[in-house]
Amino acid sequence: PTVRLMIFLQFLCNFAMTGIGPILPLYIRGMMGGDAKAVATIVGIIIFLAGGSSAMASLHVDRLTARHPMHQILISASAVCGVLFILQYMMPNVWGLGFFRALTGMFMGMIMPISNTIITLAVPEEKKGTVFGITTSLALWGNVAGPVFSGALAMKFGYGSVFWSTAFIFFFVTLLIRLQHKKVREAQARA
């Protein structure tokens, strides 16, 4: 169950980061109006900030895991991602949206390497190739499913629904991680 949850978490991170793709230019254009070139530049900057902060967090997550248990970091990062998606929606201007998008990228950058580490520790050596093949495939599927789902959701319920539904999914995952960790702790106590 832990490995499946970590694979789902990787799918979700890719789903969430790319899911906003179809609506971000339209959402920003609605916020600021203006010409398409300015909107395209701002969207590019926001995507760059989110990706850059995610990469920087991934590079330094080992320092954090040296001081805090991995499950606590995952719980915190998932919950914070949920809050940050709500804050992105609530921002009155593109710079606030960009700031919270970059923070979201930072917390997602903590999730991916930690979930990979947990998978590595939980899977027997002879099954790692298969498990990481599945993990990569599902993570890449998140890159496709995110924009499809978000586009359909935005078309039916408006742009805000994309932010709220993604936040809800992160809160749900936070709960799943907590419950899974509790089960593991209880099983270890019985052993």
Regions found by a protein language model. Give the residues of each.
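Intracellular juxtamembrane helix-capping segments at the cytosolic ends
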Residues: 110-123
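Structural signature of the two symmetry-related core transmembrane helices
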Residues: 72-87, 164-167
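A membrane-interface helix-boundary motif in multi-pass transporters
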Residues: 152-170
